Amino acid sequence: MSVLINEKLHSRRLKWRWPLSRQVTLSIGTLAVLLTVWWTVATLQLISPLFLPPPQQVLEKLLTIAGPQGFMDATLWQHLAASLTRIMLALFAAVLFGIPVGIAMGLSPTVRGILDPIIELYRPVPPLAYLPLMVIWFGIGETSKILLIYLAIFAPVAMSALAGVKSVQQVRIRAAQSLGASRAQVLWFVILPGALPEILTGLRIGLGVGWSTLVAAELIAATRGLGFMVQSAGEFLATDVVLAGIAVIAIIAFLLELGLRALQRRLTPWHGEVQ
């Protein structure tokens, strides 16, 4: 009898099992706590609404600028499209040039000796520091904006590709060579698959850096873009628009990050689950 009761209790526990993982639950709980604290502080007006509007006001403003009224002569969707175009073009260029450069540096000490000092010299410099050079050399058009974001993404991608090549076990390369594989076959079937986890991690890091550079890039005589919208709203003390723009940037960046994680799990299942 007691065995039957225990089995029933166990089946009920399984039936009512919480569907989300512990990590996801904690993340949602953290966001809920932050929103509650924000709402409480804003409602009690512990901070002036001019500097910290309540969440519902930010949501209302977000819906307003997403409509025909927009902000700064453009709707939210037009600002979003402009920013996504810039960052995707910069990311594509960084992948197109950064990965081959990183692989070449990993395979050739000569190439690494030539390019490594250049990358390491400019990599620690914040984008705002060479922003004036971009304007002087390339003007105030789209080229300077995209190039600024590209430079921010290029270094993490190239260095991750370099680290990926160096992480490939030499015994696998020698085994392929002993089986008669050509240099191109070793590169395509041994080195690239071995370096792929590091390369994809570099893309994730580079994309995060690219989003942080977006605001700086859109300071260059931009008329549309999320960074431009946030910067312009700050000049007019439109804090609700600033917070709405930051929220949109965070959500889009997070969705792209989830997409890259899914891609990494699919392309490199042997590397373990990406958390």
From Swiss-Prot:
Its main location: membrane. InterPro entries: MetI-like, MetI-like_sf. Residues 80-264 form the ABC transmembrane type-1 domain. It is a multi-pass membrane protein. GO terms for biological process: cellular response to sulfur starvation; taurine transmembrane transport. SUPFAM superfamilies: MetI-like (SSF161098). Part of a binding-protein-dependent transport system for taurine. Probably responsible for the translocation of the substrate across the membrane. This is Taurine transport system permease protein TauC. The lineage of its organism: Bacteria, Pseudomonadati, Pseudomonadota, Gammaproteobacteria, Enterobacterales.
